Swiss-Prot record:
Family membership: Belongs to the DapB family.
Gene responsible for this protein: dapB
Origin species: Syntrophus aciditrophicus (strain SB)
Biological processes, Gene Ontology terms: diaminopimelate biosynthetic process; lysine biosynthetic process via diaminopimelate
Enzyme class per UniProt: oxidoreductase
MF annotations from Gene Ontology: 4-hydroxy-tetrahydrodipicolinate reductase; NAD binding; NADP binding; oxidoreductase activity, acting on CH or CH2 groups, NAD or NADP as acceptor
UniProt subcellular location: Cytoplasm
Name of this chain's protein: 4-hydroxy-tetrahydrodipicolinate reductase
Active site: H155, K159
Length: 268
């Protein structure tokens, strides 16, 4: 039985992972971590989620429970994830990270830590979204420079980062397939008399409203036709199941930095 620790267990994603963890089979929850000022900190996770006492107290520091776990599933913030990644490397505990918003320097540190422990880092754990990544590469390579590319993402009003990590990953996949540097061609805002659209730019726009779980649309537009690839998430369960799948996979891997394309076998 694989023993799992969930960091960010009081959040929306963490709560769904905990609820689904043992339903998936082969895994047991042994630890939960949440930031010190979170309402869940210090409470029994079962009582906090309304499912009855489970005997697992939500800790405010991963160090209090890391020894009791075989794998860490982290959905926190990029700052907290950096601390958890460092501890995972120190204690040789495989880790799955679903947080987004990492800086270039933080990514360099993650790669360094991953030399000592296997880590799956993915902005989106959904199987459907990761299939879309693969499709985007094929479509972009096939259509080439004759089609304009625009990406639109829509999320709930509480989401803190924009554009979403998933939208940025989609843009990166398309840019690489077209031989472009996203830093040079990414356009994140249009306003005023900006003139004609340049041929190679990739537009990435974000909308925030209500309780929308997540929607991503990639438009390939040319004169006379338009191709759209759309992914809509109706609940967080698809992300949670993907994270659990990644956790079962990562414990069998050698140290290194992986993503969901590796988990799903798309690179083999």
């Amino acid at each position: 039985m694989l023993k799992a620790i969930v960091t960010g267990g009081g959040g929306k994603m963490g709560a769904r992972i905990i609820s689904l963890l043992e339903e998936e089979g082969g895994m047991q929850l042994t630890g939960v971590v949440e930031k010190k000022d979170h309402p869940a900190a210090g409470k029994d996770i079962g009582e906090f989620l309304g499912s009855g006492k489970r005997g697992i107290v939500i800790q405010s520091d991963l160090g209090f429970c890391i020894a009791g776990g075989d794998v860490i599933i982290d959905f926190t913030s990029h700052e907290a994830s950096m601390r958890h990644m460092e501890m995972a490397a120190e204690h040789k505990r495989p880790i799955v990270i679903g947080s987004t918003g990492f800086s270039a320097d933080e990514m360099d540190r993650i790669r360094k830590f991953a030399q000592n422990v296997p880590c799956v880092l993915a902005p989106n754990m959904s199987v459907g979204v990761n299939v879309m990544f693969k499709l985007l590469k094929i479509v972009a390579e096939t259509l080439g420079d004759d089609y304009d590319v625009e990406i639109l993402e829509v999320h709930h009003r509480l989401k803190k980062d924009a554009p979403s990590g998933t939208a940025l990953k989609m843009a990166q996949v398309v840019a690489e397939a077209l031989g472009r540097e996203l830093d040079e061609v990414g356009i994140y805002e249009r306003k005023g008399l900006i003139g004609e659209r340049s041929k190679k730019e990739i537009g990435i726009q974000a909308l925030r409203a209500g309780d929308i779980v997540g929607e991503h649309t990639v438009i390939f537009g040319a004169v006379g036709e338009r191709l759209e690839l759309i992914h809509r998430a109706h609940s967080r369960d698809n992300f949670a199941r993907g994270a659990i799948r990644a956790a079962k996979w990562v414990v069998r891997q050698e140290p290194g930095l992986y993503d969901m394309q590796d988990v799903l076998g798309f690179r083999s």
